[in-house]
Amino acid sequence: MPRSQRNDNFIDKTFTILADILIRILPTTKREREAFIYYRDGMSAQSEGEYAEALGSYYKAMRLEIDSYDRSYILYNIGLIHTSNGNHAKALEYYFQALERNSFLPQAFNNMAVICHYRGEQAIYQGDLEISEAWFDQAAEYWRRAIALSPDNYAEAQNWLKITGRFSPSHRWESWNNSTRVA
């Protein structure tokens, strides 16, 4: 029995029922349906903290899924699992792969920034300020990209960018602010 049929959560059950209806109604191939089922099972396992099971489902979905956009979300979710497991280098690889297929994933840029920021803090604790600044600069770049894609989100990142002087003057808010000033 697929994992999605074992859900005890009302929201998960509702999502599963709606997804099953959509899969039956929309014109999809058997391969696309199977890929979606594995993806859905991966999300279900991931939400319950069953990361090994989720990874197995995502890898099966990746073997079947041919749509680049859909693959980006599978790769993103694999990155999330590696982030949760503390395997940041592997997480970054998967976030990069997701962004290669779909450059409009602000959450991937945000997660990459969080990892870089964490590495910057670790470098400070190790006494390497030069390396920490490089990590913080990289975090700033990723956060600027996330904010550019989703300006109403990432308030903490926006504040950090402003406080640390890393909020680029070429950023759209700075440009907008300068263009609205009265001479």
From Swiss-Prot:
Q: In which family does this protein belong, per the annotation?
A: Belongs to the Ycf3 family.
Span of the signal peptide? none
Q: Give a single Pfam family match.
A: TPR_1
Source organism per entry reads Adiantum capillus-veneris
Q: Does the keyword NADP apply?
A: no
* Biological process (GO), any one: photosynthesis
Gene Ontology CC terms, in alphabetical order: chloroplast thylakoid membrane
Kindly give the InterPro entries that the UniProt entry links to this protein: PSI_Ycf3_assembly, TPR-like_helical_dom_sf, TPR_rpt, Ycf3/AcsC/BcsC/TPR_MFPF
Briefly, what is this protein's role?
Answer: Essential for the assembly of the photosystem I (PSI) complex. May act as a chaperone-like factor to guide the assembly of the PSI subunits.
Compartments where located: Plastid, Chloroplast thylakoid membrane
SUPFAM superfamilies linked: TPR-like (SSF48452)
| Topological relation to the membrane, as annotated | Peripheral membrane protein
Q: What name is this protein filed under?
A: Photosystem I assembly protein Ycf3
What stretches of residues are TPR repeats?
Answer: 35-68, 72-105, 120-153
Keywords of this protein's UniProt record, alphabetized? Chloroplast, Membrane, Photosynthesis, Plastid, Repeat, Thylakoid, TPR repeat
